[in-house]
């Protein structure tokens, strides 16, 4: 498991690193440390992080800022808030945190948080394995100002966010609604949809052409003529799906 600890206090990072390494819940975890959000973002760009221990009251920053950004990742890590203050607990769990632990850290409490994370990951794996794909029956309803549109999921070419609005496109048309990309992703639970940029999810079966792009990335040309650049942090997963 890859774990990131974000805390502006070096001693707190060292203490939590030690307790995680001592825990019997994990076998040789890889632990990364960051003292601010910028450093954490760089690690998230380079590594697939499974779990973040996230302090809330950072010097001149707030841990919720990073927590809100994680939804844009292809595979968001689980979050355990690790802070000295208990009054953030409600907001933390509203942010879908896996757990919330208080300083000073205790081995037993860290073990409990890690066990909870493992259980969440296990249940998620079971759910994905048990899901039988029914491409012809999957539908997406888009509520417009004057009517609702029902689309078959396999007919969708892409979904992208721009200026806070979600555009869902098909071969012949597109629809723009006030939804988030995460809203679409939770409804596109099939292996032919893949996030290729923080703003874009595409239907892999609707890719018509792949072109080289800037900084050793790619540009996807879809069957309807739309073109989408692939973000650098999404290249590895795209290559795996397309066996490039």
From Swiss-Prot:
4-aspartylphosphate: residues carrying this PTM: 55
Signal peptide range: none
Keyword terms: Cytoplasm, DNA-binding, Phosphoprotein, Transcription, Transcription regulation, Two-component regulatory system
PTM comment: Phosphorylated by LytS.
Compartments in which it is found: Cytoplasm
InterPro entries named among the record's database cross-references: CheY-like_superfamily, LytR-like, LytTR_DNA-bd_dom, Sig_transdc_resp-reg_receiver
Source superkingdom: Bacteria
GO molecular function: DNA binding; phosphorelay response regulator activity
GO cellular component terms given for this protein: cytoplasm
SUPFAM superfamilies reported for this sequence: CheY-like (SSF52172)
Residues of the Response regulatory domain: 2-118
HTH LytTR-type domain mapped to chain residues: 140-244
Functional summary from the UniProt entry: Member of the two-component regulatory system LytR/LytS that probably regulates genes involved in cell wall metabolism.
Protein name (database record): Sensory transduction protein LytR
Lineage, broadest ranks: Bacteria, Bacillati, Bacillota, Bacilli, Lactobacillales
UniProt gene name: lytR
